[in-house]
């Protein structure tokens, strides 16, 4: 298994849930040096399609206790995520997505222009703004985490469980 986020998580859950530890992480570089250390750090489950939303929502639930589970601070911060709508069409699309999310039990809040202005007062709300703001879709539980910290947390745990790491 490779030493990126997916590989490390796979090795961890194989060891934790199924007691399978005769697994080797083979990483051509270094743990946390690939995409897992360079991505956007955004955590969300704000997807339109049922299967996608529910899949990512399951991941959101894992993030909530991951620092405690790994005994490693992954710097999870559920500060919310706001997707700005820059046209009436985009606002309607976000309303549709938000409705789909709520039907699946996923948190979603539509914000009008004034609601966005209260939350992001420094944004350009002028008539001449390059990207005018019509409103937004907010997922209050969305947030960020340090994905490279997640890689190191998984690596430390699987090493202690007997999984071999070769880098």
What are these regions (language model features)?
Residues 32, 120-129:
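FAD-binding beta-loop-beta segment adjacent to the flavin cofactor pocket
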Residues 15-39:
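Glycine-rich FAD pyrophosphate-binding loop
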Residues 11, 15-16, 157:
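Gly/Ala-rich phosphate-binding loop of Rossmann-like dinucleotide-binding domains
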Residues 40-122:
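Dinucleotide-binding Rossmann-like beta1-alpha1 core, especially the glycine-rich loop
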């Amino acid at each position: 298994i490779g030493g990126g986020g997916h590989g490390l998580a796979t090795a961890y859950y194989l060891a934790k849930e199924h007691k399978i530890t005769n697994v080797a992480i083979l990483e051509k570089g270094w743990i946390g040096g690939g995409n897992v250390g360079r991505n956007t750090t955004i955590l969300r489950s704000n997807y339109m399609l049922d299967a996608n939303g529910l899949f990512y929502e399951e991941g959101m639930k894992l993030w909530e206790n991951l620092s405690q589970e790994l005994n490693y601070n992954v710097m999870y911060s559920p500060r919310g995520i706001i997707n700005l709508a820059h046209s009436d069409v985009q606002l309607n699309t976000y309303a549709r997505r938000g409705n789909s999310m709520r039907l699946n039990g996923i948190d979603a809040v539509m914000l009008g222009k004034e609601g966005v202005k209260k939350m992001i007062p420094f944004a350009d709300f002028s008539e001449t703004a390059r990207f005018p703001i019509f409103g937004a879709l907010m997922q209050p539980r969305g947030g960020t985490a340090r994905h490279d910290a997640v890689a190191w947390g998984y690596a430390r745990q699987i090493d202690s469980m007997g999984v071999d790491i070769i880098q």
